[in-house]
Amino acid sequence: LKPGDVLGLVGELGSGKTTLIQGLADGLGLDASAVRSPTFIVLREYPGRVPLIHIDGYRLEGAPSVVWLDVDWVFSSKKVTVIEWANQIEDCLPDDYLELQLSHKSVNQRLIRMIAHGARSRELVAGIGGVVHSPQSTVHKRAGQES
């Protein structure tokens, strides 16, 4: 990931959205243990070499509820932005973002479906194919946009 990337996470409660964001924070060199669900404050920023913005879209429930967010700041090219429950604020998302749909495969396994919305997101999906190392993990490409 690099500054300006936006990830939209979708999945039921307990599907691993916050845990995934903790892993992303660790990969960005941030303190992953500091990452918590932003449920009661809606947005958290984790400063670092590449700052991470973590938004909870669940409580925002649609575009009218997010007009108070400074969208230019949130989706700044100087930050990585990750939105839990991104489907709740789809109308506010930028044109280019990577949607990650999380679901339970088993008690300790998750299935992540990636849908690219834009050129940069397609680059991210293509790059992930080369870094998936788990023998249980697979990356499937469909229609040049979904994985």
Residues covered by each model-derived region:
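Hydrophobic anchor at the beta1->P-loop junction of P-loop NTPases
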Residues: 9
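The conserved Walker
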Residues: 13
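Conserved lysine of the Walker
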Residues: 17
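Short beta-strand-centered segment that lines the nucleotide-binding/catalytic pocket of NTP-utilizing
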Residues: 30-45
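Short phosphate-coordinating micro-motif centered on Lys-Gly-acidic
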Residues: 66-67, 72-147
